[in-house]
Swiss-Prot record:
Negative regulator of class I heat shock genes (grpE-dnaK-dnaJ and groELS operons). Prevents heat-shock induction of these operons. Keywords: Repressor, Stress response, Transcription, Transcription regulation. One of its GO terms (molecular function) is DNA binding. NCBIfam families: hrcA (TIGR00331). GO terms for biological process: negative regulation of DNA-templated transcription. The gene is hrcA. It comes from the Bacteria. Coiled coil: none annotated. SUPFAM superfamilies: GAF domain-like (SSF55781), Winged helix' DNA-binding domain (SSF46785). The keyword Transcription applies. The lineage of its organism: Bacteria, Bacillati, Actinomycetota, Actinomycetes, Kitasatosporales. This is Heat-inducible transcription repressor HrcA. It holds the Pfam family HrcA. It comes from Streptomyces griseus subsp. griseus (strain JCM 4626 / CBS 651.72 / NBRC 13350 / KCC S-0626 / ISP 5235). Disulfide bonds: none annotated. Belongs to the HrcA family.
Amino acid sequence: MLSERRLEVLRAIVQDYVGTEEPVGSKALTERHRLGVSPATVRNDMAVLEDEGFIAQPHTSAGRIPTDKGYRLFVDKLAGVKPLSSPERRAIQNFMDGAVDLDDVVGRTVRLLAQLTRQVAVVQYPSLTRSTVRHVELLALAPARLMLVLITDTGRVEQRMIDCPAPFGEASLADLRARLNSRVVGRRFADVPQLVQELPESFDSEDRGTVSTVLSTLLETLVEETEERLMIGGTSNLTRFGHDFPVMIRPVLEALEEQVVLLKLLGEATDSGMTVRIGHENAHEGLNSTSVVAVGYGSGDEAVAKLGVVGPTRMDYPGTMGAVRAVARYVGQILAES
């Protein structure tokens, strides 16, 4: 167990290295921080930190830099989440308030996260498997042709054309619309099949074929749209950190091009709290020199998707965690109000 003083030395090393991009020496630490001890004592503390794997000495420098283990201890024990300033919060709100639909919300969120953190931003679209139904609309386009419009609690809109086996009157259409909404509004998509399975039997025999066709189209829409989607932005930010990657930046870029890799990264994040994965904690080899900060977002208490950033392990963790958390909250508010 590290003493409080050595934890403070580690905190100072992380802060200085993140801020200066240069390995940190004992003399610089005592000059920049009020550690209350001599450079010789700090050197001894740094030797202990190095022996225990929290810092390391690059072969080109006499200073020390944090290891993945050091960053992990910093995040778990020493780093608080840095709140955004009032101007930053107002800027976020003004930028996000202009969104007109879900695609625009996701696109703006990606750009905002990338600008705030100067990292690569990744935003997952709300998953229909976690969403609930806000409304189902049925519109008559012709006597035997309908349009089904499905609206989710996250503002997602899906449209399908339906060719009916027989003409379907306005009264029957209004009846089906009302009965369908009474059963499924506010319910999770996973529950919908069971909720509507007996609905055709409650209609006259001449309408049952059309009702069954409408329900089949609705359920097929749920299956088709369960594929996860995401948006990525700010990849060019990585070019500013070329020296942070031990070999080359290409493996990182290649990993970021694989949607399956990114979906797995976000999938490993918890729904409720902040998830920070550092260096080799990331299973994908191409991301072993990066850190991932992610959190769930949603229109209520339950997360419907996740968002986060990917950057070098030499990251401003308090500031990044604060930005990711704040943006997630604003997106959740927009979805709830939309």
